Amino acid sequence: MKKAFLFTPALLALSINAVSTAHAYDRVYVFGDSLSDSGNNGRYTTDGATSQLYVEYFTQHITGTTLIPSRENGGTNYAQGGAMAINYKFNTQEQVNRYLNSQDGKADPNSIYIHWVGGNDIAQALEDAAKEKDPQERQKVAAGVVVSSATATANQINQLIKQGAGLVIVPTVPDVSTTPRFLETVLTQVLTPADYKELSEKQKEAINQTIHGGLKSVHDGINTFTTPNKEYRRLILEGTLKKIIEILSPNEVEAKYEKLLAAYNQASAEASKLTDTYNEQVSKLIDTKNGNILRADINGLLNEVIANPTVYGIQNTLGYACPYGVKINECSANMSGFAEYQSLFSDSFHPTPLGQKIMGQYITSIYIAPSQVMTLTQVNRASVKSALSSLDGHLQQLRNGGNEQGKVGVFGGYTGNQDKTFTLGSDYQLLDNLLLGAMYSNYKEERSPIADFSYAGRGHVLTAYTLWNYYNNGWLSGDFHYSRTNYESLTRTIQLGEATRREIGSTTGKQWGARITAGWDIPVTHYLTTSPIIQYAWDKGDIDGYRESGNNSTSMHFGDQDYTSKVGTLGWRVDTQLGRFNPYASVQFNHQFGDTSNKLRSFMNTDSSHASAVMKSDKQSTNWRQYTVGVNANLINNLRGFASVTRNDGNSQDPSYNFSLGINASF
């Protein structure tokens, strides 16, 4: 038996550009406090006039527009510094009401909404609780404020959902016990005498000056250190507390230090618990059934940064960058006393521009994640397209010089570039005008179909085909295929400050479908024929949902994906019969009748509410053209070869060029 090898099509440039980018929301509306305020009451970060906030970063990257404060004409950012969920001069309920009233009570379904509030509410809860002497009463008061505020927050989010909001991003509230303000509050309580209220104004002023002097010394001292991890951060914190005791009570250092440390630990635990209660209450009450909600885990991100800040480009997470006593709206990195090390906090409560950028990068990454994963609906077709392109070249050659009845043909080969595909096939000339065949393709590819998303794919394609020649000039071919591809190392790459994080998962994709193609050869000369082409292709595929292996703030899981493709094709081709080498050319016009966009549901791994966001891709190309030139070669005896190149025009889902090389033999 003679051996033959086929070099199947090389899909050299499979470039899926904006096929599955997220549905293009055109606006971002923001409700919240100073963390999100871009100019209504102020800009709460270092060099606020020129520094970009997380909401501005996100808006710019997703919509390509500039976020404007609501106090300006056309502004969509309603956030206000100092805002709480309820019961304050500035609150998010009033912000939401103002927006809805401006829209006749309806929320724009083509917009993104960010609702983030709670830090001031928890701080208020701690302040109110501190007025109570009884520990149980303190806990009761604090819990009451937190539950009421969290309930109001959830109700406002549900109000937006009920009125038609497209997508609501709901970040978790960061742990207030990690802020420098919390440490300063505890130290202030320690430095304030028990009979402070009974003192004269002059005595109070003297004590206040002493307190401010002590806090400034603590601030300046902390800023001389770096905190590369939680352990170092804790050591510096404990050293700070001990230094305070050494100044206040040099004769009772150890006893009073232990008492102060225990009091700090208890207060910190209570503040963390209140933060968790707030976040859990919001998660419990938001309408996850009807709402399209992305629950961004900012609290988890904060803890990750504190645990290993250096990789993000941050050197100090305990202190703050601005000089003590300088208001955040007036703080500049150029002023005297500004921290030498890159800090997480600008002042005692607000993040630095780098902290804002990290939050913006984080929310952007989890927002675009579904669009990255949706590219698999196009990637899943690559192995089939490679196999069928090879089959088309093989059948084209058989139409020009078929096998005799009873002959067996064999072809096989290897394709290598971005993908590597091994193909082995065989066919049998059952009648003088009827061919039956089958082939197997093994597919391997490692690539990045879209920015910051890559995979390793290993697949198998089984194809059965037939070719029927009738009335001398007519021909009809059909094929049926099934493919299964294992996607390993599905990797999302996420930039967070200077850190590069990767979230990894794996899944499986399947596709099955059929094609029928017909043509009629029209003789022009003895050496030249031309033919119309008509084709209909149907494909159905699915990709299993998968869960990324991590449990970080960026870790996600995704639902199942499925698609149906129905493509009709009209074309024309020209063939030559010159002898040993026979060039040919064709043009085809394709139209997609099936799915032109995809949907994908995504979840955050760390979210207890099971909130999910359904993202819809932009529409795919529905009309495109293919131009093919090639040559069939009669080599020696029963050995033949072919080569072709196809140019795709108007279809961003497919490669710009397909190259096919092949050799087949019959015996």
Where are these regions (language model features)?
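Outer membrane beta-barrel transmembrane domains
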Residues: 358, 362, 410, 414, ...
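Mobile gating loops/cap/lid regions near enzyme active sites that modulate substrate access
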Residues: 185-273, 285, 292-349
